[in-house]
């Protein structure tokens, strides 16, 4: 067995699934009706670009779908892909929102990244796209 094959065989199932993941959407079953979808992802992790320490956050996504809806397993795997990513709180929230907007083109979307306090500092980053419609 070559060293490349040995390395590939050491890749854990979850790591492989995360690496292969993509944001998948499906057709909105009720595109004529304004409604909101709320998704909470309580286990977001990334790495601080300054200290290298892990950062933990709860992501709260609220959106009004257009013609497409985000598939839940796909968003879970996408969010898990940030685990070893060195990125600031602000860039993480903005990049995630941008990627979700490209994937599903919502009428309106808001992402709140509520980071666990570290060093007595609690950070919440809230970003949005589009105009919220009455439901």
Swiss-Prot record:
Subcellular location(s) per record: Cytoplasm
Record's keyword terms, sorted: Cytoplasm, NADP, Oxidoreductase, Queuosine biosynthesis
A GO molecular-function descriptor: preQ1 synthase activity
E.C. no: 1.7.1.13
Uppermost EC category: oxidoreductase
Organism superkingdom: Bacteria
NADP is among the record's keywords: yes
Entry-linked Pfam families: QueF
Residue numbers annotated as active site: 48, 55
Binding site for substrate: 70-72, 89-90
Function as written in the Swiss-Prot or TrEMBL entry: Catalyzes the NADPH-dependent reduction of 7-cyano-7-deazaguanine (preQ0) to 7-aminomethyl-7-deazaguanine (preQ1).
Family in the record: Belongs to the GTP cyclohydrolase I family. QueF type 1 subfamily.
Protein name: NADPH-dependent 7-cyano-7-deazaguanine reductase
Organism: Prochlorococcus marinus (strain MIT 9313)
High-level lineage: Bacteria, Bacillati, Cyanobacteriota, Cyanophyceae, Synechococcales
């Amino acid at each position: 067995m070559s060293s490349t094959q040995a390395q590939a065989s050491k890749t854990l199932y979850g790591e492989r699934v995360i690496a292969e993941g993509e944001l998948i959407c499906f057709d909105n079953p009720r595109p004529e009706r304004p409604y909101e979808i709320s998704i909470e992802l309580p286990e977001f992790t990334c790495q601080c670009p300054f200290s290298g320490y892990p950062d933990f956050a709860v992501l709260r996504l609220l959106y009004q779908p257009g013609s497409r809806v985000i598939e839940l397993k796909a968003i879970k795997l996408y969010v898990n892909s940030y685990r070893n990513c060195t990125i600031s709180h602000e860039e993480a929230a903005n990049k995630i929102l941008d990627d979700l907007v490209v994937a599903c083109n919502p009428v309106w979307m808001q992402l709140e990244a509520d980071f666990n306090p570290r060093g007595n500092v609690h950070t919440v980053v809230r970003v949005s796209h589009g105009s919220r419609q009455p439901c």
